[in-house]
Design a protein with these regions (language model features):
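Active-site hotspot residues in diverse enzymes, especially metal/ion-binding acidic/histidine motifs
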Residues: 1-261
Length: 261
């Protein structure tokens, strides 16, 4: 799937962009979620949440966002708050309560329906296009610029990688794998090869070694193109650049694939 967005996504991003303009955001440091929420009539509290990462309770024009107090990572907490603000601003459904599981938060791009739209809102709110796009104009695709953006904007590597692929002018894609299988793929507009969701990782990929208990290399490496891509559609393409990072806590791998010019 390329990064051409459906109408609901564009509407969500527009709503987030309007919020950023309202509060005069000009730098990453200006994205103060708690201050925005307070002004919007939304209270943020931490509380035990069984089976949920966050919960939005709406009452009239106001709301409370409950964030799991078990969440140890500030980047995930920020995404949870931004995600719930998306539900609040976009008036999702008629229920007064929305419960978002850790699955909804973890599968940034794989989520369905309103969860996916709230993720789009959160992506623009935390990683605004007008600030991020120029930082994605790189000559070589790897996780170094992604990490730099994530550190600057206090965002997760997964959310940042998706925005990076969205705006990077190079031919690239980001993949997420669990249980030695490709779970989801997000491709840049010019990334033409097909990558099948659900395919078992080829033994020639770097990501495969993570699930064999081996340490992934720190740097990108050239791998056979057909190890990742549909071999019937590759033409003269023989190699791609792969950079993979493993998450031991999640049992997952995030991978950048780049086709050199």
């Amino acid at each position: 799937m390329t990064n051409e967005l459906p109408y609901d996504f564009m509407k969500a991003e527009k709503s987030a962009a309007e919020l950023l303009r309202k509060y005069g955001v000009e730098t990453p440091e200006h994205i103060r979620l708690e201050d925005m929420a307070y002004d919007l009539g939304v209270r943020i509290v931490e509380a035990p949440l069984k089976g949920a990462a966050a919960r939005l309770l709406r009452y009239g024009k106001n709301a409370t966002i409950r964030v799991s107090n078990a969440e140890r990572y500030s980047t995930r907490r920020r995404f949870s708050v931004a995600h719930e603000l998306g539900h609040f601003m976009l008036y999702h459904g008629h229920s007064i309560e929305f419960v978002c599981s850790d699955f909804d938060m973890h599968d940034w791009y794989q989520a369905k329906g309103n969860e996916r739209i709230a993720n789009a809102f959160a992506g623009e709110l935390l990683l605004p296009r007008f600030l991020v796009e120029k930082r994605c104009d790189v000559k070589e695709v790897n996780f170094e610029p992604v990490k730099a953006i994530a550190d600057e904007f206090q965002t997760s590597l997964t959310a940042t990688a998706i925005r990076f692929i969205r705006f990077c002018p190079e031919m690239c894609a980001v993949l997420f794998s669990m249980d030695s299988k490709v779970k989801w793929v997000y491709k840049g507009n010019d990334f033409w090869p097909y990558i099948r969701i659900g395919k078992s990782l080829d033994k020639r990929t770097l990501a495969y070694f993570f699930f064999q208990g081996k340490t992934l290399p720190n740097d990108p490496e050239d791998v056979d193109a057909e190890a990742w891509l549909d071999s019937d559609r590759l033409g003269d393409l023989e190699e791609v650049v792969e950079h993979s990072i493993g998450f031991s806590r999640l049992g997952a791998v995030l991978t950048l694939i780049w086709i050199r010019p």
